[in-house]
From Swiss-Prot:
Family: Belongs to the RNase E/G family.
Name used for this protein in its record: Ribonuclease E/G-like protein
Gene: rne
Residues given in the record as Mg(2+) binding sites: D296, D339
Highest taxon above the source species: Eukaryota
Biological source species: Porphyra purpurea (Red seaweed)
Domain S1 motif: 35-117
UniProt entry keywords in alphabetical sequence: Chloroplast, Endonuclease, Hydrolase, Magnesium, Metal-binding, mRNA processing, Nuclease, Plastid, RNA-binding
Any single GO CC term annotated in Swiss-Prot or TrEMBL for this entry: chloroplast stroma
Keyword Cytoplasm: no
Molecular function, one GO term: endonuclease activity
Localization in the cell: Plastid, Chloroplast stroma
SUPFAM superfamilies, per database record: Nucleic acid-binding proteins (SSF50249)
């Protein structure tokens, strides 16, 4: 389904486009991400739930490991109490299988795996596995026989769907690389003190080409010379299982940011706003809570049908199409509850569910409609595949900050600022790019605008006086949906030192 892949090595972001529309965003996570391998230390053990917390050496939540994921650590197969497996301050080799959420640490396993394009090496298993997506029985028998011949004696192999029709020498070469990678990880575990990160897949070019490049890819655009060289290498290495036509590879050289040219910035900005307008005139709200996500559909101004029943059905079907897209672009996972506009006709309900299921079938995260409840709510689940877009951009260490330099404020009562608003010139671009700000309570300001304002999490106020005035804090209260969460006041004398540290995060554009 892919037509174009856009990779920004400078921002560690990639987008998968189909017919010009962004279908998926890939954002490299600077913190925990799936497949990271750590040498951790056991921090706490909870025998009641047969689980433990593992310190991974970062100032965040510890990793969580359940007894079901401790297979290689068990001395005997029938051990069913985690206290017989782990002890406090014990060093263990673990891998992340689920990225952390806003209030939970990463899920860990001791069953380490190393993924390649065609095979997955399992150092602590001796199993031979063939992907369920390989349906041809002859191909399955062939791959199983090949695995028996090439498998290391103490390791296991899993063949991915991309292994179909691949020459044995190529698979052997990849197996050799994975084994060398594993030996390097083992050596690092011996030579380093726990807790420490041993392996991280930081190459966004490799990740995107390995996971998303296929026969339908026509164009690949990248904004880095080094990235283009890597791209050529991976394309030439893995081209054998695709058509003979190599896609067009383009180095992006325009002065304009690649994320703006392909409207990736705009897509991210819109995906962070709860309200989504529908093509036919309705709208919906998407609210993500800790336990589940709620989507509320409303007809709005749409009334172009011959009957109210037809209006409701068309609006709901339009919303179903948009919801399927929003789940992918926002990477929303877990339990999702949708409140469509009420429909009394069971025939209309069936038509809506059939249409919705068809739209969801295009999602590789395998959403499943559970039921239409008695209250008319559609319940579905979607498999978690990495962090949601909101969780990624809420991480201030990955993205930019937003700076406001205030002129000295007169000592006026804070209440007098409540009627003040941003100047029209400032408000025009703020509200056009990200419709999240309600009011800003200060008199005069100069705003140093970042190219990606919606990435901002922290607001730094540069005050021209040495005195930290409480009125400034009151004056700078923002009401945001998903952005600024911390306000910090810096005297102007600290400003220049701060700029030296964060130069790469600040643009020279003065609004």
């Amino acid at each position: 389904m892919t037509n174009t892949i856009v990779i920004s090595c400078l921002h560690n972001i990639a987008a998968i486009l189909y017919c010009g529309q962004i279908q998926k965003l890939v954002v490299a996570n600077a913190h925990y991400q799936v497949s990271d391998i750590y040498l951790g230390t056991v921090d706490k053990i909870f025998s009641g739930i047969n689980a433990a917390f593992v310190d991974l050496g970062k100032n965040e939540y510890s990793g969580f490991i359940h007894i079901s994921d401790t297979g290689p650590l068990k001395k005997k197969y029938y051990i069913n109490n985690i206290t017989n497996i782990l002890t406090i301050r014990q060093k263990i080799l673990v891998q992340i299988i689920k990225e952390p959420t806003l209030n939970k640490g990463p899920r860990l396993t001791a069953n380490i795996t190393l993924s390649g394009r065609y095979i997955v090496l399992m150092p602590f298993s001796q199993a031979i596995c063939i992907s369920r997506k390989i349906y041809d029985e002859d191909e399955r028998h062939y791959l199983k026989a090949l695995a028996i011949l090439i498998k290391p004696p103490t390791m296991g192999l899993l063949f991915r769907p991309s292994a179909i029709g691949i020459d044995e020498e190529i698979i052997l070469s990849e197996l050799t690389n994975l084994k060398e990678q594993w030996y390097f990880i083992q050596k690092s575990a011996i030579n380093n003190c726990a807790p420490v990160l041993l392996y991280k897949d930081e190459d966004i070019v490799k990740k995107v080409i390995r996971d998303f490049y296929d026969n339908n890819t026509k164009n690949i655009v990248i904004d880095s010379n080094l990235g283009l060289k890597q791209l050529n290498y991976y394309i030439n290495t893995w081209q054998c299982n695709f058509s003979s036509t190599i896609p067009s590879l383009q180095l992006y050289s325009s002065n304009k940011c690649i994320l703006d040219t392909f409207r990736i910035n705009q897509a991210i900005s819109r995906a962070l706003i709860p309200k989504v307008d529908l093509i036919l005139g309705g709208y919906m709200f998407i609210e993500t809570l800790e336990a589940f996500t709620i989507i509320d559909v409303n007809s709005g101004s749409f009334n172009n049908s011959t009957s109210a029943r037809e209006t409701v059905l068309k609006t709901n079907c339009s919303a179903a199409t948009e919801i399927a897209y929003q789940l992918k672009i926002r990477n929303i996972a877990g339990v999702i509850i949708i409140d469509f506009i009420d429909m009394e006709s069971q025939r209309d309900q069936l038509q809506l569910l059939e249409h919705f299921d068809k739209e969801l079938s295009l999602d590789d995260a395998k959403p499943q409609i559970v039921q239409l409840s008695e209250l008319g709510l559609v319940e579905l689940t979607r498999r978690r595949k990495g962090k949601s877009l909101y969780e990624l951009v809420s991480n201030d260490s990955n993205y930019f900050h937003f700076f406001i330099q205030l002129e000295q404020l007169d000592s006026i009562k804070p209440s007098s600022y409540k009627s003040k608003r941003l100047s029209s010139s400032v408000k025009s671009w703020l509200f056009s790019e990200i419709d999240m700000i309600n009011r800003v309570f200060f008199k005069k300001s100069n705003l140093y605008r970042l190219s990606n304002f919606y990435y901002a999490r922290n607001l730094y106020i540069i005050y021209s006086d040495f005195t930290v005035n409480k009125n400034i804090q009151l004056a700078a209260r923002y009401k945001l949906m998903y952005s600024l969460q911390n306000i910090q006041i810096l005297p102007s004398t600290w400003y220049f030192n701060f700029l030296d540290i964060h130069t790469n995060n600040i643009t020279n554009y003065l609004s």
